Amino acid sequence: MTEESSTVSEICARGRENLKKIGVDGLFPRIAPTVKANRQYLDSLFYETRLFNPVDVDTSLNLFNLKLRTPVFCSAISRLPYMSETGMADIAKGMADAGSLIMLGIVNSADFQAVIDTGAPVVRIVKPFRKTERIYDELREAESQGCVAVGMDIDHFHGVLMGGERVRATGQFGPQSTEELKQIISQTKLPFIVKGVLSARDAEQALALGASAIVVSNHASGSFNFSVPSMMALPKIVQSVGDKLNVLIDTGFENGEDVFKGLAFGAKAVGFGSSIVLALAADGSRGVELLINQITAQLARIMAATGCADLPAIDKSVIAEIPFMRQ
């Protein structure tokens, strides 16, 4: 089977095998209860086919003043220990070649510059550092380097959860008051994203503070074990603020059918993280591009089968919930 015809699961499997060869085994071994519940909920959602009167499908969208070919983006990602020196840039190139963007988490200046040099659309997500001057420094750097948007992980206000048990980085990260966050948002000309929103209340607060977008996210289970699963939190959030800012989502999405369900529930775009890391390990930037292309192809097929010509046409009217599938 050629690389071009590889499925999403085959790309990820090849990535795992390549990581094993360098001594990295059992990548992403633990799945938090909130992510398991999110998976069960996604698997309980089915779509209604509408096969007569076929439509030509367009998966493109406008986001952060960009025309993207796909609503599938790379969630905020940081350099992992086993990545090569070009790993971050390779992900960025793969995302750009697939017609999408990359969000960056913690990166050093060299990695950041390498990503920028690929020409990929870049979103810089900063951490809620207790030393707020570092926040401003990173925002200024993002602006000067041509990022298309910036943002902050509010779900790290109280540190990072490692392996579901160990809390770390509480000395480095800390909660930002609403006044502090409002000031931070006001200091950048770029669209500001609040990442880690899991309630309508926080979504409304983000809007009031001047955010242009939010990411409904549990940080790949790196924040809380039992927070509301992102897909279950999404409808109330969309109902509350969906017509006023861009609502994005991530955490536990695996394929184009998952993306379709996220869009049907009101998200404008869907982020992937773990799968992209595996695709990078499989075939470098080409693996990332192949992964995003395959996910987008899956999405396009379901759109065609449900009579949805473009992304705005996807809504909950094509979704049927089958609760017994969650048992």
Segments (PLM) and residue ranges:
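N-terminal pre-core extensions flanking Radical SAM catalytic domains
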Residues: Q294-P312
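Short beta-alpha connecting loops at secondary-structure transitions
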Residues: V277-V288
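Short, charged beta->alpha transition segments
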Residues: V55-N65, M103-V115, E138
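Short FAD-binding loop at a beta-strand-to-alpha-helix junction that anchors the flavin cofactor
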Residues: R69-S75, I249-T251, A269-G271
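Active-site cofactor/substrate anionic-group-binding motifs, chiefly glycine-
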Residues: L63-V107
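Alpha/beta enzyme core
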Residues: A92-K93, D97, T118, R130-I249, ...
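An N-cap/entry alpha-helix motif that binds or orients negatively charged groups
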Residues: T2-L68, A313-I314, A320-Q327
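A gly/proline- and charged-residue-enriched helix-loop-helix capping module
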Residues: A96-E133
